Swiss-Prot record:
Keyword Zinc part of the UniProt annotation: yes
Keyword Glycosyltransferase: no
Necessary cofactors: Zn(2+)
C4-type zinc-finger residues: 39-61
Any single GO BP term: translation
Molecular function via GO: structural constituent of ribosome; zinc ion binding
Gene Ontology CC terms: ribonucleoprotein complex; ribosome
Name of the protein this chain belongs to: Small ribosomal subunit protein eS27
Length: 86
């Protein structure tokens, strides 16, 4: 007897794995990452940690790029970012 709600536990869908806690995934992986942030004023690119606990300023024009919150850092309005690859 096969039920429609059967889920393959060895090969779960990626969407369901992303919703789980980082320690309860099939393969543990962190939620944090490094990112390249482009300054809106001088277009300098700075590498920033996603869960930064300090204010990050642009080395070129001293503009604040991101501010810490309780979890992920909040980017300043107008700054663009891209996730760094492995």
């Amino acid at each position: 007897m096969v039920l429609q709600n059967d889920i393959d536990l060895l090969n779960p869908p990626a969407e369901l794995e992303k919703l789980k806690h980082k320690k309860k995934r099939l393969v543990q992986s962190p939620n944090s990452f490094f990112m390249d942030v482009k300054c809106q004023g001088c277009f300098n690119i700075t590498t920033v940690f996603s869960h930064s606990q300090t204010v990050v300023v642009c080395p070129g024009c001293q503009t604040v790029l991101c501010q810490p919150t309780g979890g992920k850092a909040r980017l300043t309005e107008g700054c663009s970012f891209r996730r760094k690859g492995d």
